[in-house]
Amino acid sequence: MWNFKYKNQYLNYVSDLMQDTAVQSMRLLPQHRAGVSCYHHSVLVSYASWRVCDWLGLDARAAARGGLLHDFYLYNWRDAASHPGIRHGSQHPEVALRNARARFSLTWREEDIILSHMFPYTPTKVYRCLESAVVSTMDKLCACLLYTSPS
């Protein structure tokens, strides 16, 4: 994957999540472009959010954990048959939150990060904390970087 400068400190917050079989299954799900899995995108968002929140003096643990689980929807979003009745763009945060609640104990900040990460596309899911705004911004930035970087 990537060579993160502060990998060990970051892993203190997320290693338990990363060892979960459902989180690992995200490696099999495509994300924004070919060759990038939902897992790899989520780790990149999580790490970037953790660094920014740590620098800002915010809850870096919540940013790391919420960032890792922000796309924990567990279906192939490119295959409509794998998620019947779900409008992926607007509803996947709710699916991700439901899946995360079923497997992990979440703080209110982690829940808000997952639920509001698509704002303003989901205009009724406004950030309730700064960590959510950071993760949402890092999600959009990472998606743009993944789309535009050479293969």
Give residue spans per PLM region.
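Active-site micro-motifs of SAM-dependent methyltransferase domains
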Residues: 70, 74, 120, 143
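All-alpha prenyltransferase/terpene-synthase fold signal
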Residues: 2, 6-9, 119-124, 142
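Cofactor-cradling patches in redox/metallo enzymes
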Residues: 136
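Conserved small/polar residues in nucleotide/adenosyl-binding loops
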Residues: 147-151
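Acidic/His-rich, divalent-metal-binding segments that scaffold phosphate/diphosphate chemistry
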Residues: 1-79, 85-86
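Histidine- and acidic-residue-rich, metal-dependent catalytic cores
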Residues: 25-53, 62-63, 90-124, 130
